């Protein structure tokens, strides 16, 4: 499985082509749209979410509600594009139009300046448009397709916010996966402790008044995977490494960890490793899951627990100082439309990005031309692991 996305923040549309999805998978635009709606929710989202109501169009690879094994083409129209027809025109335009929304005041923390340097842009909008988090809408759409495959194999995914703008969420110890998923999806903050919602919302509102933004830490959990996905034989085949790269590819994500993560640096080995146990009915398992479901780049059969840290959104309504790229004079950075926080939406993006990596790994490890062969091979392997 592989895919590419294309499109700009204020361009005509976002597009993706996905190759490698097995034939015979039940798939509809409505299934994908449900996931896109999750991305657009969450407390703290701004005006664009009222402008855009993302709906995907499938133009290839699906016939009569079933995938054909051919490349799947997805398109999401940008409704906001109608206000940017001349500025984002594909055809050549007059110089006066080019100057309309030209950006020469790069925003600290964004791709504006470095992208302009790399690609020799005199208008930094070219870097801004493609590097925008708007692109993550299409990665959620791709992830939605991947999650349909995972569901057929009995694999579930969830995400929730652990730290919201410096406020740690009190997660009940040993909270079951199903409870985490249910609680987070019921919360417009994507947290599992409803008692903290009022405090966090007040914090968001105050930060918004100050023209500032908030970051945080998000946890994604994958439940139902067997032991042995991934490999230790080469560095680039380690599944946790692939997930780490994917998480860090999400806009504004600056760190990733599995299980106990960086806390392991403060512990002894006996406080970190997951003891192995065996039972005649359930096979091998672990007493704990401190390593987050991975050993040597391979799944252990425990839930995958991966955390990502998202920096505060760098577009500030109280902008930081910058420099005009034409005059080199100090200026306050350009202000583009932004939100005080996008953590709940980022959690949906992270969940779908991780789901895509997991699906890709499964499709590479098992026969995957069609869903019948995939399911037979996958469940046969799960049975083998169970009786090892």
Curated annotation (Swiss-Prot):
NADP(+) binds at residues 39, 45. PROSITE patterns: CHORISMATE_SYNTHASE_1, CHORISMATE_SYNTHASE_2, CHORISMATE_SYNTHASE_3. It is an enzyme of class 4 (lyase). Its cofactor is FMNH2. GO terms for molecular function: chorismate synthase activity; FMN binding. One of its GO terms (cellular component) is cytosol. FMN binds at residues 130-132, 251-252, 296, 311-315, 337. Reduced FMN (FMNH(2)). Disulfide bonds: none annotated. Pfam families: Chorismate_synt. GO terms for biological process: amino acid biosynthetic process; aromatic amino acid family biosynthetic process; chorismate biosynthetic process. SUPFAM superfamilies: Chorismate synthase, AroC. The keyword NADP applies. Pathway: Metabolic intermediate biosynthesis; chorismate biosynthesis; chorismate from D-erythrose 4-phosphate and phosphoenolpyruvate: step 7/7. Keywords: Amino-acid biosynthesis, Aromatic amino acid biosynthesis, FAD, Flavoprotein, FMN, Lyase, NADP. It catalyses: 5-O-(1-carboxyvinyl)-3-phosphoshikimate = chorismate + phosphate. Homotetramer. HAMAP family: Chorismate_synth. NCBIfam families: aroC (TIGR00033), PRK05382.1 (NF003793). Belongs to the chorismate synthase family. This is Chorismate synthase. It comes from Streptococcus equi subsp. zooepidemicus (strain H70).
